[in-house]
């Protein structure tokens, strides 16, 4: 019999953890579907989804089953060997997308790191060492490793860690003329989020992505889509590129891919993938049997008309109610996004106060996010039911009313 867990409290974070986070005052201890309970037993409705991660809510039966069954078989073998869940997952991702090859990692940052390394390696092998420059959008977010944080182009994340990486240029998002002016035959890749998440939940314009694809083709550059947040059903298609009809050369996935279990994936073509030959890149835990089994189960549930069509319908339910709240209280001037990745942009009077909205919402037992100090973000479970949406938005409206009225 195992010993009982020692009691911990929020203050223990400040005592023992590196202070790079500022977590909420309460500690979630249990979740079921779109509801979470804290240490005191208080129940909250989850519109945050672990930052667009818990795509099927908490403790989804299919994911619990996959994890517990795999846990009784084998946990880890390293990439000296392969394993059955990883191969099944890779095959299903290939069957469902443009891709012909898959690299499995542990996170979105790792998937992006692999994507950026592959883009440079491919260009080096095919065109020569002078073709290494990467163009990305300003206010992007691609991860926290030194390479990915430099590609992201947000000084608040990249400053203070030594010299910035050379060969990385940032241009305004959705500005095709700026991209056209920046790209050259030295460009190895253009890296874009189909929807900027941390940048404020900004969807790409159709002409922008189409133009980026054309420019990449003209300059023999690879088009890389970071779909860590927008992928795996989040927008009502399995991946956002399918909504736009613009096919990338490399795509990164994570977050919803594991439904709450850590996993990332880089998807690409066979012609490009062959340039990551044996020993050029790797990961000890990437594609481990536990993570792969859970991700396979998540993919099976998400990639169905019932779930994907439901995401589109739920978007309209959220949007219409949030627009009414914005008009009633004068706090939001735009509701934007796609599917169940939604941003409520604050009015001039409330700009910079997204954290205040989050804190007010928590007091009314609903969990939301921010996507900058000016935007409140919603990224709930893809299978949240209408009753929970309505109840959660009622709580959210109470929070907004109290905040606005002081």
UniProtKB/Swiss-Prot annotation:
A Gene Ontology biological process term: arginine catabolic process to succinate
GO molecular function: identical protein binding; N2-acetyl-L-ornithine:2-oxoglutarate 5-aminotransferase activity; pyridoxal phosphate binding; succinylornithine transaminase activity
Database matches in Pfam families: Aminotran_3
Cellular compartment(s): Cytoplasm
Pathway annotation from the record: Amino-acid biosynthesis; L-arginine biosynthesis; N(2)-acetyl-L-ornithine from L-glutamate: step 4/4; Amino-acid degradation; L-arginine degradation via AST pathway; L-glutamate and succinate from L-arginine: step 3/5
Oligomeric and partner information: Homodimer.
Listed PROSITE patterns: AA_TRANSFER_CLASS_3
Name this polypeptide is given: Succinylornithine transaminase/acetylornithine aminotransferase
Note on how the cofactor is bound: Binds 1 pyridoxal phosphate per subunit.
Cited function: Transaminates both N(2)-acetylornithine and N(2)-succinylornithine.
Organism field: Pseudomonas aeruginosa (strain ATCC 15692 / DSM 22644 / CIP 104116 / JCM 14847 / LMG 12228 / 1C / PRS 101 / PAO1)
Cofactor: pyridoxal 5'-phosphate
Family: Belongs to the class-III pyridoxal-phosphate-dependent aminotransferase family. ArgD subfamily.
Induction notes from the record: Induced by arginine and repressed by succinate.
Residues with PTM N6-(pyridoxal phosphate)lysine: 255
Residues annotated as binding pyridoxal 5'-phosphate: 108-109, 141, 226-229, 284
UniProt superkingdom: Bacteria
Catalytic activity: N(2)-succinyl-L-ornithine + 2-oxoglutarate = N-succinyl-L-glutamate 5-semialdehyde + L-glutamate; N(2)-acetyl-L-ornithine + 2-oxoglutarate = N-acetyl-L-glutamate 5-semialdehyde + L-glutamate
EC number(s) stated in the UniProt entry for this protein: 2.6.1.11, 2.6.1.81
HAMAP family documented for this protein: ArgD_aminotrans_3
Binding site for N(2)-acetyl-L-ornithine: 144, 283
């Amino acid at each position: 019999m195992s010993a009982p867990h020692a009691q911990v409290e929020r203050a223990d974070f400040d005592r023992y953890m590196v202070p790079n986070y500022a977590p909420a005052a309460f500690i979630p201890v249990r979740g079921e579907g779109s509801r979470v309970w804290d240490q005191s037993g208080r129940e909250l409705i989850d519109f945050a989804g672990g930052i667009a991660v818990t795509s099927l809510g908490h403790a989804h039966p299919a994911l619990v089953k996959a994890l517990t069954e795999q846990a009784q078989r084998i946990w880890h073998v390293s990439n000296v060997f392969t394993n059955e869940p990883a191969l099944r997952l890779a095959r299903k991702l290939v069957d469902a997308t443009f891709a012909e090859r898959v690299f499995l990692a542990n996170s979105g940052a790792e998937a992006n790191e692999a994507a950026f390394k592959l883009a440079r390696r491919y260009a080096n092998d095919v065109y020569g060492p002078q073709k290494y420059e990467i163009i990305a959008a300003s206010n992007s977010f691609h991860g926290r490793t030194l390479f990915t944080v430099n590609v992201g182009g947000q000084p608040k994340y990249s400053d203070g860690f030594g010299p910035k990486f050379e060969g990385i240029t940032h241009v305004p998002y959705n500005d095709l003329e700026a991209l056209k002016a920046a790209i050259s035959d030295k460009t190895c890749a253009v890296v874009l989020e189909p929807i900027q998440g941390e940048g404020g939940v900004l969807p790409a314009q159709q002409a922008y992505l189409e133009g980026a694809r054309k420019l990449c083709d003209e300059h023999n550059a690879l088009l890389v889509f970071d779909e860590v947040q927008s992928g795996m059903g989040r927008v009502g298609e399995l991946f956002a590129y399918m909504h736009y009809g613009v096919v990338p050369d490399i795509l990164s996935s994570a977050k919803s891919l594991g439904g709450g279990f850590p996993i990332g994936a880089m998807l690409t073509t066979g012609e490009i993938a062959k340039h990551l030959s044996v020993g050029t890149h790797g990961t000890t835990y990437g594609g481990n049997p536990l993570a792969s089994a859970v991700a396979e189960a998540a993919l099976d549930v998400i990639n169905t008309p019932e779930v994907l069509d439901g995401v589109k319908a739920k978007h309209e339910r959220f949007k219409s109610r949030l627009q009414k709240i914005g008009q009633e209280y004068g706090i939001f001037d735009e509701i934007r996004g796609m599917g169940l990745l939604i941003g409520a942009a604050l009015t001039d009077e409330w700009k910079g106060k997204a954290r205040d909205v989050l804190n007010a919402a928590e007091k009314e037992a609903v969990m939301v996010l921010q996507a900058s100090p000016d935007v409140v973000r919603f990224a709930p479970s893809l299978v949240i039911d209408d009753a929970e949406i309505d109840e959660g938005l009622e709580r959210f409206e109470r929070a907004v009313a109290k905040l606005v009225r002081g």
